[in-house]
């Protein structure tokens, strides 16, 4: 799965499909060999990174258009979902008519408050955000299950322009989700990408001040580590091709998403799943 920004796209696949949206971002996906390219969702503005929870639900944190009063959006992304943003709405305030007449052009995004969560009079043609936040999301990743500490096992992490790493939980709400924000982690300078290492620590890429950095974040003490963290690191270092079917089946019950996926992919390769 990967995201495209709102400058639009025109994609023709080898299977004969055409995906064309000149003024919208989108989420695409394909098989590992590059076949079966498919547009999974549309209407994102700048959803830079994607992350799945332990049940396969897909989320992203989308940047806003920098209008006064507008806010960034937390997105729950489902197959075929349309999230509403169009590139041309970015420039309505800069059009010649607006500049010459002094009369603001009608902007559905702001006038109809399409960036806010669902409500009684919300437009029915788009999938609304599950919550607002700000400002400047960039890196975004999930805890695969055993990283850091047990109380952060089902959390998501996001970098922003305030040099923080913000912490979120996505909680079921009807057929969708809501999000809850926890205490942020203080980051470095200009944090961008995020990744969970096989050692269970959280890593952040940083830029600025003429130098690049990699920051590592972890619990204050090893006694606070998730109890399955060391076992997860051990399993991640093993070759799945050298494991028995029984061992791979055991891995499917791991509390860590990476171990489960490792076992699943190998069992599929062997034709046993």
Locations of the language-model features?
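Beta-propeller domains with acidic blade repeats across secreted/periplasmic ectodomains
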Residues: 1-247, 262, 266-269
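Alpha-solenoid HEAT/Armadillo repeat architecture
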Residues: 252-253, 268
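Short inter-helical turns and helix N-cap capping residues of alpha-solenoid HEAT/ARM repeat scaffolds
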Residues: 255-256, 272
């Amino acid at each position: 799965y990967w995201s495209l920004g709102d400058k639009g796209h025109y994609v023709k696949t080898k299977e004969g499909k055409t995906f064309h949206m000149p003024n919208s971002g989108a989420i695409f996906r394909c098989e590992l060999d590059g076949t079966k390219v498919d547009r999974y969702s549309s209407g994102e503005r700048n959803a830079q990174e994607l992350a799945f929870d332990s049940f396969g639900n897909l989320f992203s944190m989308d940047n806003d258009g920098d209008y006064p009063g507008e806010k960034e959006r937390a997105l729950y992304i489902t197959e075929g979902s349309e999230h509403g943003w169009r590139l041309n709405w970015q420039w309505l305030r800069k059009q010649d008519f607006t500049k010459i007449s002094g009369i603001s052009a009608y902007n559905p995004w702001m006038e109809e408050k399409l960036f806010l969560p669902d409500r009684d009079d919300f437009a029915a043609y788009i999938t609304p955000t599950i919550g607002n936040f700000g400002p400047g999301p960039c890196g975004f990743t999930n805890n695969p299950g055993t990283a850091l500490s047990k109380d952060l096992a089902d959390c998501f992490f996001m970098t922003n322009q305030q040099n923080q790493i913000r912490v979120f939980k996505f909680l079921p709400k009807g057929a969708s989700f809501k999000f809850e924000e926890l205490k942020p982690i203080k980051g470095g300078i200009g944090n961008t990408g995020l990744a969970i290492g096989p050692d269970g620590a959280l890593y952040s890429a940083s830029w600025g001040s003429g130098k690049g950095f990699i920051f590592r974040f972890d619990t204050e003490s090893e006694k606070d580590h998730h109890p399955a963290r060391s076992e997860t690191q051990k399993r991640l270092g093993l070759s799945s091709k050298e494991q028995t079917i029984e061992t791979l089946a055991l891995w499917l019950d791991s509390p860590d998403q990476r171990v489960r996926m490792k076992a699943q992919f190998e069992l599929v390769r062997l034709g046993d799943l």
